[in-house]
């Protein structure tokens, strides 16, 4: 089957949607399908080679305390028409159809079956820029979306307010061959200190300021502890580093951007993974990554995280923006190594449910279902639902 995966975001910059598409590309290619990724790109994308089709030049746009890298060109039509006519896709799978401008333009000129995956919800980065117009355009073209996927119930609730109808909830996945408990920890952090790990962009909504305040309380009670901050910097990084210096807080390591290959080693190095996001998260991908490696989690009890983990099972959940509660949860796990091991083992079991192999098969089954119905009524005997779920 020939499949197009369309991203509105700069494919040269890592992020949740980009990583999701890369995972589907890997799995579908392994299944024997002919996959192309269509997206804007600020530079080359060597990871997928000639399977990548660049359309549009992304621009960095400040949005919701983040940077949204999308193409806002109104002159995409000639390139889109040429690509669609040449490639003749069986399925076009649009990711974040609400985001301007690429997905709505591809949908306009598509003459094949179209699927949309809705990853985020109102308040997510970029959704205060352009999405009301895109939502109106998408509503007018909604009949061209033959299948709608939401990665979580919060994402579905938001999307269905604007594009009503049936949604299949198919979550994000985790690559269990990559995020594995068998990876080696980072040697320089193996000095007897209890390591707390944060992974994410240094944006206000990720809650690092609350973790720094909580860690100040933790450090006072457990001097032999360390906070490792992993993630691409933003304009807030200098502010956070200045706060750490002025407060005299020791053992806070800003590791900066870490490659996908190196990331599992950070999770393995951590005794506790902490994600204190304040909201606007439709799904907890970083939770799954930590769980897959066997690291217990301390997370805020927000909608996107509550759908992935259970309080007291894979870790502990606290109210968002409650620094003292966050510190208390961290201290509880730091003082109880058997509990950490127990929660880590439960997390690994939970992560098995989100194996990208399983998730990709669920998505592919929807492709088959859509193509077997009017107006397509196409049959792919070699890819029936039984073989897809094998």
PLM segments and residue spans:
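Conserved donor-binding/catalytic core segment of Leloir-type glycosyltransferases
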Residues: 188-216, 228
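Short hydrophobic beta-strand element within catalytic cores of glycosyltransferases
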Residues: 296-299, 309
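Acidic donor-binding loop of glycosyltransferase active sites
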Residues: 268-282, 295
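Short alpha-helical donor nucleotide-sugar binding micro-motif in glycosyltransferases
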Residues: 257-258, 266-270
């Amino acid at each position: 089957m020939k499949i197009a995966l369309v991203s509105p975001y700069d494919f040269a910059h890592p992020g949740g949607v980009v990583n999701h598409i890369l995972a589907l590309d890997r799995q579908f290619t392994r299944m024997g399908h002919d996959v192309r990724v269509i997206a804007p790109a600020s530079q080359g994308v060597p990871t997928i080679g000639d399977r990548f089709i660049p359309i549009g030049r992304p621009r960095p746009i400040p949005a919701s305390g983040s940077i949204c890298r999308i193409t806002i060109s109104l002159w995409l039509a000639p390139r889109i028409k040429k690509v669609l006519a040449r490639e003749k896709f069986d399925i076009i799978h649009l990711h974040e159809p609400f985001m301007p401008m690429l997905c709505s333009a591809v949908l306009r000129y598509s003459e094949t079956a179209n699927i949309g995956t809705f990853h985020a919800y109102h308040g997510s980065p970029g959704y205060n820029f352009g999405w009301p117009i895109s939502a109106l355009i998408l509503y007018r073209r909604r009949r061209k979306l033959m299948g709608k996927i939401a990665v979580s119930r919060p994402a579905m609730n938001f999307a269905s307010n604007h594009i009503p109808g049936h949604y299949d909830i198919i979550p994000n996945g985790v690559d269990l061959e990559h995020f594995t408990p068998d990876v080696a920890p980072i040697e320089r952090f193996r000095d007897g200190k209890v390591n707390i790990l944060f992974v994410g962009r240094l944006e206000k909504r990720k809650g690092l300021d609350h973790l720094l305040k909580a860690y100040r309380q933790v450090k006072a009670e457990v001097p032999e502890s360390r906070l490792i901050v992993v993630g691409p910097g933003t304009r807030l990084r200098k502010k956070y580093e200045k706060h750490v210096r002025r407060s005299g807080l020791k053992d806070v390591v800003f590791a900066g951007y870490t490659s996908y290959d190196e990331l599992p080693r950070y999770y393995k190095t951590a005794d506790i993974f902490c994600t204190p996001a304040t909201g606007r998260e439709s799904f907890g991908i970083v939770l799954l990554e930590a769980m897959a490696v066997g690291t217990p989690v301390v997370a805020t009890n927000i909608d996107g995280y509550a759908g992935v983990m259970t309080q007291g099972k894979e870790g502990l959940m606290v109210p968002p923006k409650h620094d003292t509660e966050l510190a208390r949860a961290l201290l509880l796990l730091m003082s109880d190594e058997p509990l950490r091991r127990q929660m880590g083992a439960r997390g690994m079991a939970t992560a098995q449910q989100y194996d990208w192999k399983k998730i990709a098969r669920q998505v592919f089954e929807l492709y088959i279902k859509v193509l077997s119905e009017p107006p397509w009524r196409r049959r792919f005997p070699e890819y029936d639902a039984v073989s897809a779920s094998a």
